[in-house]
Regions:
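Short loop-to-alpha-helix "cap/lid" segments that border enzyme active sites
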Residues: 1-87
Length: 87
């Protein structure tokens, strides 16, 4: 995992999102719990319906170095990759 803001991590729980229909319920929960983190599948992250707090999202699995840089520059919390040893 590549993390942008490791020092600010205060959550011990989160939601795994791998289907687009989970976004609406997750958004409602994000408004109720500011410590809730989201592990978001890459294609869901790029969905036009994606509207979660970026600073609480980890995007998976991103295996292209340029794409990793682009996603991290969007201020997400982190990225999961299979190529960490090649970066």
């Amino acid at each position: 995992i590549i993390l942008n803001n490791r020092e600010s991590f205060k959550s011990k729980y989160g939601i795994l999102i791998d289907k687009e229909n989970q976004l609406f319920e997750s958004k409602a929960m994000s408004n109720l719990d500011e410590k809730l983190m989201f592990m978001v599948e890459k294609e869901i992250f790029y969905s036009r319906n994606f509207d979660l707090p970026l600073e609480r999202c980890v995007v998976w699995t991103v295996n292209d170095k340029d794409e990793i840089d682009n996603v991290l520059n969007m201020n997400v919390y982190g990225v999961v990759t299979d190529i960490g040893d090649k970066l």
